[in-house]
Amino acid sequence: MTRHAAPILTTLLDTDAYKLHMQQAVFHRYYDVTVTAEFRCRGEDMLGIYADELVQQIANMASLTLTDNEFAYLSSLPFFKTDYLNWLRTFRYNPEQVTVQNLQGKLDIRISGPWREVILWEVPLLALISEVVHRHRSPQITPEQAVSRLKSKLEQFKRLTCDLDMSRFRLMDFGTRRRFSHDVQLAVVSTLKQDFPWLVGSSNYDIARRLNIAPVGTQAHEWFQAHQQISPTLENCQRAALQAWLDEYPDRLGIALTDCITTDAFLRDFGSEFAHAYQGLRHDSGDPFEWGEKAIAHYQQLNIDPLSKTLVFSDNLDLDKAVGLYRHFEQRINVIFGIGTRLSCDIPQVKPLNIVIKLVECNGKPVAKLSDSPGKTICHDKAFVRALRKAFDLPRVKKAS
């Protein structure tokens, strides 16, 4: 299938902010670390038929470079150091790092190489897969249809919140990875900027730059996964990851992701020093109400006022779920809502893809993600899962994918 040969990705900044934020930390601290990542389709979609077209699109990515205007934009932000940005100017995607196959109808993708380079593949590659598939399945869909759907949801949102003080409600666009298309995401976020006063930013650097809104994002599971092999001891790997992040970003980007090895294990490592230093926590699996209560209780046990901290909710959210969480928590702790697929691929008759790319190896050794939702568990090596479970005193883990 090669109907759409024109490049879908046209800028290096069409990615999520946390990828550049993590890449800078890897560039400074783990320059020679190597990793392998793999694609997973959590649904039943047989996506192998798109392999040839994806190979062509991946080849196109080798020509993407940071433009002078984009360099100036990144230089104006408080996150980046000059040595990293100068290196990023020289960065080129290397398609030889990516193996794409159609295995009996299933799409198989494996990415291997230096972490500082591999780290940038995940988000644009997922966006690419999503857009290629939706172009074939729903060629008639336009950005206007997505905006029409959004506007009806915003009317429903007004009705849901008419009795609420919304002054503390904040929304972020997290829609890049599973969007219908770049044009749909841009149209949706543009509409939110115009019609939704609670929008505070986008995870997509290109869209944030175009619309003059804040780029948002800190770190992903891979930051914690890689430290399972970078850290000299497995028991200390989460603390090592948390400390390395603070060393790179001592006074900003202070939201920590909690569910790489379950939230309970994370909170045991998230002691007073980390809890004071970090601005807050991000939820990405498991029951969000239960998680939020655990987080508040943890801060209270450490004699930290929860109202001085922030919880970011980002797991399979829509506006209705966000309102429910806001009602429950907003008077006790600051809350922000990151909504992805339900903004950038919420179109009648369109089924979003449930796809991910996750680390499976670091320096040739296994890493794992054992989240608060067993269906999201990822690891090849059962012995390593057992070692991780023992190191963090976890209950029996359901079958890894």
UniProtKB/Swiss-Prot annotation:
Q: Which residues cross the membrane?
A: none
> Posttranslational modification, per the record?
Transiently phosphorylated on a His residue during the reaction cycle. Phosphorylation strongly increases the affinity for substrates and increases the rate of nicotinate D-ribonucleotide production. Dephosphorylation regenerates the low-affinity form of the enzyme, leading to product release.
The Gene Ontology CC terms held by the record are: cytosol
What InterPro entries does the record point to?
N/Namide_PRibTrfase, NAPRTase_N, Nic_PRibTrfase, Nic_PRibTrfase-Fam, Nicotinate_pribotase-like_C
Q: Which SUPFAM superfamilies match?
A: Nicotinate/Quinolinate PRTase C-terminal domain-like, Nicotinate/Quinolinate PRTase N-terminal domain-like
Q: What class of enzyme is it?
A: ligase
Query: What domain of life is recorded for the organism?
Result: Bacteria
**Enzyme Commission designation:** 6.3.4.21
User: Mind listing the GO biological process terms from this record?
Assistant: NAD biosynthetic process via the salvage pathway
Q: Which GO terms describe its molecular function?
A: nicotinate phosphoribosyltransferase activity
The UniProt catalytic activity note for this protein reads: nicotinate + 5-phospho-alpha-D-ribose 1-diphosphate + ATP + H2O = nicotinate beta-D-ribonucleotide + ADP + phosphate + diphosphate
**Keyword Phosphoprotein recorded:** yes
Pathway(s) it belongs to: Cofactor biosynthesis; NAD(+) biosynthesis; nicotinate D-ribonucleotide from nicotinate: step 1/1
In-chain residues carrying the UniProt-annotated modification Phosphohistidine? H221
Which keywords describe this protein according to UniProt? Answer: Ligase, Phosphoprotein, Pyridine nucleotide biosynthesis
- Tagged with keyword Phosphoprotein: yes
Family matches, as PANTHER family: NICOTINATE PHOSPHORIBOSYLTRANSFERASE
Q: What does this protein do?
A: Catalyzes the synthesis of beta-nicotinate D-ribonucleotide from nicotinate and 5-phospho-D-ribose 1-phosphate at the expense of ATP.
Q: Which family does it belong to?
A: Belongs to the NAPRTase family.
List the protein's name.
Answer: Nicotinate phosphoribosyltransferase
Lineage here is: Bacteria, Pseudomonadati, Pseudomonadota, Gammaproteobacteria, Enterobacterales
